[in-house]
């Protein structure tokens, strides 16, 4: 089977090449479960895999059935280091749905708020500790993209990209590169 062009099986192309496994960073691996399971193999070899944040049209998923939470838990049970997992969205990217005949039935734009809503869901619905939930959006992708420690952490010399949150993780202030971009929610 192929994982975004990388064959994953008993004898992978990764084992036959000098290309470092960290070079491969497949995204949207939760678009189907078979792809997700194959991607776990890549993560165990040292690659980083990315799940797409869920669409939260009304804030949190009310019934608590957030599929990303289940997939992260499945990856943990499979022995995947959580440092090998990232979460992202196609914020402001277009999406489309087709019927069984390939006809376009719906199209739209992904909400940039999905990542923040996903963070809240991980903590409030999934029981993730805030520091671990944040790592899927901050330090993990920064390390995978070799931007750490300039990005993905709070440290001297880092860019000072911060979210200040209140109760129930209500967003209060956004700081980017040390400049306040939004204040008082």
Regions found by a protein language model. Name each.
Residues 23, 130, 151, 171-172:
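Internal amphipathic alpha-helical segments of the cytochrome P450 catalytic fold
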Residues 28, 51-55, 89-91, 134-137, ...:
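Active-site proximal loops enriched in glycine and acidic residues that flank catalytic Cys/His/Asp
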Residues 1-98, 104-105:
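Active-site core of metal-dependent hydrolases
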Residues 62-65, 99, 143-145, 177-178:
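Short secondary-structure transition/capping segments
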Residues 18-19, 46-49, 107-117, 184-185:
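Short, surface-exposed linear patches
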Residues 77-158, 162-163:
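His/Asp/Glu-enriched, well-ordered alpha-helical/loop segment
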Residues 143, 153-185:
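C-terminal cap of metal-dependent C-N hydrolases
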């Amino acid at each position: 089977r192929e994982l975004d062009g990388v064959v994953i099986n008993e004898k992978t192309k990764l084992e036959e090449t000098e290309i470092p496994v960290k070079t491969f960073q497949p995204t949207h691996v939760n678009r189907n479960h078979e792809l997700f399971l194959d991607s776990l193999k890549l993560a165990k070899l040292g690659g980083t895999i990315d799940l797409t944040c869920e669409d939260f049209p009304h804030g949190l998923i009310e019934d608590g059935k957030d599929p990303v939470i289940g997939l992260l838990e499945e990856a943990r049970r499979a022995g995947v280091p959580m440092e090998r997992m990232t979460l992202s969205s196609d914020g402001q990217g277009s999406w489309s749905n087709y019927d069984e005949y390939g006809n376009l039935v719906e199209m739209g734009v992904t909400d940039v708020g999905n990542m923040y809503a996903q963070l809240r869901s991980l903590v409030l619905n999934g029981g993730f500790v805030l520091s671990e939930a944040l790592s899927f959006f901050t330090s993990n992708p920064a390390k995978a993209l070799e931007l750490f420690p300039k990005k993905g952490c709070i440290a001297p010399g880092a860019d000072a990209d911060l979210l200040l949150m209140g109760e129930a993780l209500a967003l209060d202030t956004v700081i980017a590169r040390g400049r306040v971009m939004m204040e008082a929610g």
